[in-house]
Amino acid sequence: MHPRIIPALSLKFPPLAIFFAQEPPSDAKEMRSLCSMLLVAQAAMGRTMAITRGTCRCPGAGKGLGLEPSNHGTIPGGGECYLHFFPTRKQDLEHGHTMIQKLTVGGASQTMTDDRSGREYLYKTLEGMVQRPGHLPRLQPEAPYVVLKPLEALVPDEKPKVVSLLIEPDQLPALVSLSDRTRPGIDRVWLPFTAGCASMVLYPLHEAERTNPRAVIGLTDTSTRFYLRKALGKEVVAFTVPWGMFVEMEETISNGLIKHCA
């Protein structure tokens, strides 16, 4: 497939097909990483990346990539430790010490363990954080691997669940407009408050199951931007859509619309 949207928007990076697989594709590269965003960067450079539960040392990556159920009780230190991560100092909790020790044993970098032992200040109160898990999509993993692959490199038996476009902010208006052209309403795009991996995989997968799916703007998480800045630059955001929605957008590309928006 040669997407029309690439020349229309002069995309710097190839659209990424994201799908599940029982086995890694023959052209896939498997590598361990601290953060899944480093693997996203590899895919953006044209490589096929196959990710499984043990690939990333970040304890939230398996959930954000749809490889584990959204159950935060399985995070090192337990659910209580997770809840206290954002609004309070986890190093003051017994569970917090457990999580930090497990991360260290697992080979996490000093940067990551220092980050997890402090605060992210994303929630003002614990009460706000307690409500967060109830808003997360509940998806069951479809296969052991999630694959990130340039859309143009797909072989006939590979079909993406979602497609992610890594774009610059000036290209966002065109994609928002394309998303809203074919269906009524004004809520075809949203930006969830979530991790980078979840914004590219978990939430778009959830949207793919809805009757009226939405595009998901992502890579707005502060940690995500730290890991991607060196590899892809500081201007990159993600615009991820279910496969059917991407096909609709491809069919309705308007040169006039692109000229005014991109």
PLM feature segments, named:
Residues 2-262:
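Acidic, serine/proline-rich low-complexity intrinsically disordered regions
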